[in-house]
Amino acid sequence: MLRHSLRSASKLQSKNVRLLRAAPLLLKRSLSNDPKEVFTKLTDENDPQRDAFFKYGWGSWLKNDKQEKEKRVTRFSIEGLNKVLSDLHEQSAQADKTAKTDAVPPPSYNPNLTVSLPHNVTSKHLGTPKRGESVRVVSMASFHEGKHHRIYKIDTNAGKSFVLRIPYGIDEENTLAYRVKSEVATMDFADLKLGMNVPKVFCFGVNALNPIRQPFILEEYVPGRLLMKDWMPLASDSADGSHKEKLNSVIQPISEFQAKLAETEFTAFGSLYFAKDYRESNEPAYKSDTDGDLADRWRIGPSVERCFWRKKSALPFEQRKQYLGPWTISQPLDIVKSLGSLEAENARARLAIKQADASPEAEIDEQVLRDQITAFENLAKLAPVMYNLKTKSIPNMDAIVKPRLCHPDLDPMNVILHEENGKPYLLDFEGTTVKPFILHNNPQFVAYDGPKIYDLERDVENYSKLNAQEKDQYEFMYKRTRNQYLWESQLNQNAKHLISSIAPLVKLLRSPYVYAVQRKYDQEYLLIDEALVQLKEVWELFAKNELTNSEQFPVEFTEEWLRQHAEKLNAYHEKLIAEPFSATQGWMPQDLFDNLVKSGVLVKDANGDHSLKQ
């Protein structure tokens, strides 16, 4: 996710500004309250002063810390960045000389293996250096280290700032290339077709063969503050109802983004690409008689939804590709089947590598992989009968199975309020895909699948007689219920024809799929199994109401399997409680890690790994 750091670099003092004029480049890290400043020479590619600027420092892992951090080093060529910026300025100068038309020019595939968007590459957006000067970078700040990429703020002598996004090299080259191509095309679509406030993309590269020597996206820097600063999810209710206004001040703009994204009905399921980046199809991404040059600008290609790419290195890319789509508009549930089949095949490949003693995953349990195969095969079996696509029991069924954009990161941490006009900007589009709206889930910042409490006094027996700790637990459930209700109320207001997608029974039917999409860690396959078990218990009711077109649940569970499943699920939950960092695979923020080491809570072993002191 693209985040603007809450602790941005402090402004330079006057003496540093004078040094800046004398020095070719200033590097700043802003990951602490005391940002460090380092000067480097542009002509010295191997300057050791630069090393810390590229290293990962946002957090640490209890195990394999060195290896995990090495995967996230984002060393790139600063000299190459200057060349890319210079090339963009040359393109803008040429564009200023050519005749102006209303037509939006197609992306420019440049000889240096970058792609630029000419309609954004203008002197207005890029700035103009002083007469006689060539454009160059004068300072860079390490702005944020996210889950999937690093964010740098770039300042130039042309008076403009930019954001440079470098994805971590965790995934292999094909994965990164598809992700970057699709994200830029989706942001372009949101800007040109939907008129949304998003950062303008100037240039991107999909591999390390460009001058920057890394896959990258160079885009507009949007100054402002994060919407997250206004989000108070556990705020208590106020007598005058003002708490709803405060909560809705965050929920409403994000809901409006969702409604805008869902506005267009596409011609297939998958993800957006520029036409030249997906030549396997000649069909436009959507049908239009009025959009002219825009209608043929994009295509629907393979899905870049994270679940289709996460930890799939055990499978060769060509083997994976058959499961990635695009999928025909007449078969909306094939997405679910493909995901189940891909995950099962991936688990088989990992198991084979493990059994051959060739697996880099030392701690993975073979039985866990076998159980995963079964769980995902069961999900694939469920897919064809998951919904009755012709049912009259679900209002507007035709509308909610149409292909619509699904943004996986609708979150106040991904929205910035522009400092000049207060308008919300949606920053990051990584992993955005086109799928049936009935398969979209509520955003994580409001999602809640626990017990629903709408009124504490009415829904909780003897609430007033409970002790303080018990009241706190119920109040937490109430506030989570309240926040989700406010979100769903906004959906009803902004896209009423799609509201049936969040009906409780509709949610329950898609729950195994949602857990598969959101799965990050190996043992979370147990949540898919549990959702299937719960679904089987009420399947007869669904069949009677024609919500599904199969009277028989497609999966059978033996009593022995159910017993073992309950034991494994309980053990997993106990592990989460006993090992506080197991849910993050041993990762923790750097400040916390340093404090725990300093206080002796974390101890280091002979292998360099850390554990909690017993």
Swiss-Prot record:
The keyword Transcription does not apply. Residues 1-38 form a transit peptide. The lineage of its organism: Eukaryota, Fungi, Dikarya, Ascomycota, Saccharomycotina. This is Altered inheritance of mitochondria protein 9, mitochondrial. It comes from Eremothecium gossypii (strain ATCC 10895 / CBS 109.51 / FGSC 9923 / NRRL Y-1056). It is found in: Mitochondrion. Belongs to the AIM9 family. GO terms for cellular component: mitochondrion. Residues 110-125 have a biased composition (Polar residues). The keyword Mitochondrion applies. Coiled coil: none annotated. Keywords: Mitochondrion, Transit peptide. Residues 90-129 are annotated as: Disordered. InterPro entries: Aminoglycoside_PTrfase (IPR002575), Kinase-like_dom_sf (IPR011009), Mito_inheritance_9 (IPR051035).
